[in-house]
Amino acid sequence: MKHSLYAYTELSASEFKESLINDFEGTLEILRQGVSTFEKIDTRPDFFCLQRDFQLNLAELFGKIETRWNENTLNAPLKAFFGNSSLSNNGHVLPNIVLFDDRVNVDQALLIYGALKNKVTYVQGPPGTGKTQTIFNTILSAFFAKKTILISTNNNRPLDGIVEKLSFSYDNHKIPFPFLRLGNINKIEETTLQIREAFQIEDEENDLSVNELEILRKKVLSKNREAVIALTNFQKRRVAEENLVFLEKVEKMGARSSIIKKQKPLLQKQIQEIPYVSEKDIISHFVSLKEDKDALKYLYCSSLKHLAKLHSPKYDVLHEIVLIEDPRERAMKFNSFLSCNENLELLLDVFPLIFTTNISASRLGDGDVFFDLLIMDEAGQADIAHSLIPISRAKSLLLVGDEDQLNPVITLDENTNEDLKKEFQISDTYDYLANSILSTMKAADKVTNRVLLRNHYRCGKRIINFNNQYFYHNKLVVSPSLEEGNVSFIDSDNHVRTPVKNQNYEEAKNVVSYCKKNDISDCAIITPFVNQAKLINDLLIKNGVKEVKAATIHSVQGAEKNTIIIATGVSSFTSPRTIKWLNSHGEIANVAVSRAKKKLVVFGDEEKLKNTKTGDSVWNELIRYCKSKGTVEVIPSENDSLTIGKSNGSITEDEFYETIEQIVSIKKRLKVVRNLPIKELFEEYPNSQMEFDSVIYERGVLGGFKPCFAFEFDGGEHYSDAKRIESDKRKMKICEQHGIKLIRLPNSFSKDYEFLKKLIEGYKEDDTHEQLTLF
């Protein structure tokens, strides 16, 4: 299981390392502030092997880009990156568009048109606008156009969503669509098995020759020819109308020039000459692939033709690799095979469609093999440097993303970033910390057209209208078929301080209470803070709520649920700095709200958010919106049924016993006994039912062992249960009478090797045997 350091502290990796070396105990205390109630810091010594799948040499990539710049051989997408783009496209030939079904609108069709026609296309895809389906249709269209296609993203989740759609059948046969899913070593292990299976597929059922297959392809494309012509005219008319509106606005502002006088009548004439066609009519002209037997037959036969090439002797080396039984060896050999340009070209001849992350694209040859089309999804989350890996390998680029959603996660010190900008005279356009690849290229490239996907199909109207007003300036067109949707706000005033920062106990308790009372199932709980998510999940588990989980926003990007609960995590103890950070990341609210299909519930401390002066606050606006468009609710406290701080029982004791055994194993005069009844330790208490969690004995000078330490681990019940409190007092008195140290520790210290080691060493140095100060 992987855990990010940033989930527990705001220190960078380098700062944490330096702090750990210089102040071990102080650094542990910083970590303790970040762990949840049921987590523990483990300082027991361990040996482990740290290994990366591969080393990425960005300097080599940038050197190659610089060489291309000097030789004036940059590919079109890189020219656009440097602001040297032009309006040139892929000629006057109209692109051929293939749509899987009729779930498409004109904006989506224009996106596909631009991707196949232009060298570079920028797409803003707000939430719920059918972005994934449109990319899927673009892939189908590019496949019918016989293009090699690279689909890349910053992480795996968007890729998985697209790959899931590539499942077709023809005449009761599954179509073995020729694509590969690359990525980390585990993905490669799976992919090589897929290739092994592909070697076993025969072409016997494909009764079409190469020429017959080409005739069938052209037949399929001809069915959508009329629709493509109508779409072309629609776009020309729309551009002319927009330009005319712009000129008229300039005129109203008092501008007078010969250019305006000359251009206005030309635009008016152009608009009159282009036949008007409605968006509905354009879409109705398209023949959907899933209803077209010819199209499905082409997909089936063409896929078989691609895979049949594997039987050529040219692929013998690849065949030997995929037959290797050891998964890791097989994957490593395949990666080595893939790094050779000639091998990559062979592979693309069989599998013209490749899915990979931006970083893993570095394995695709040495960068001199170019894909016909690169589709980069979630480009608003992709950092500049790693995005250039796939961009440098493409002839054409479709860049899809949304700058109003999540930004790249970049671990670079701000001061270092500013120093680098000054040293190398880097403009704000290429500011590594402040930009994604999408924002940089749109700022640098003033020529290329932008496409906005405007039609929203996911959220209830009341829900998405907030995003539409606050983030998209009412440009979104909400589908009339959507439900109204419900929004509500639940004020969670909090005066309970938890030992962990960025937690609101009352809010967490109310969220769980709401889930139980309303029997919530198809739901996600979203919070900006890892610690609040941990607290909510702890309470959900304790209260038997298994269907719902809490997570931060990055975990739910791209997902959708009937109900979304937003837990802001803000309380009266939240620092102004944290709230300022929260307000500066409005994209969290945009993404969180737009995950909800039917119901949005916002929990928060309205008073705290309202009274903290940090400028414009999307969270205050969201609360106001929910109150004006929906309901306001207060959930009564249910402290009797929701408790935190319970002891973990045997789990904690197991962890402590393992830790303490390591310590006493290197101190031969010590031994440890677990769960020792008091009646066995002291004969004068034969009827006592009490026991110590652990007792440490020390060997005397003349032999024999004498008890010196007794350990007890305390959960919340040790401070709230009257019987437990009385029992603890009796244990303390017994220990005092017999000269034994009774050490009470919170559960979180059960795995803290260094703390317990120093505690025992401190005892041996303490001749007076006075009680040690633990906190």
Model-derived features with residue positions:
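Pre-P-loop entry segment of helicase/translocase ATPase cores
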Residues: 1-117, 188-213, 317-321, 326-334
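ASCE P-loop NTPase helicase motor core
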Residues: 11, 88-201, 332-472
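Conserved P-loop NTPase motor core of helicases/translocases
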Residues: 85, 91-96, 157-367, 408-428, ...
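Conserved motor-coupling elements within RecA-like helicase/translocase cores
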Residues: 343-348, 550-564, 571-574
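A short beta-strand element within the Helicase C-terminal
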Residues: 370-375, 559-571, 600-602
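Helicase C-terminal subdomain and adjacent C-terminal extension
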Residues: 413-451, 487, 540, 576-666
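Nucleic-acid endo/exonuclease domains
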Residues: 624-775
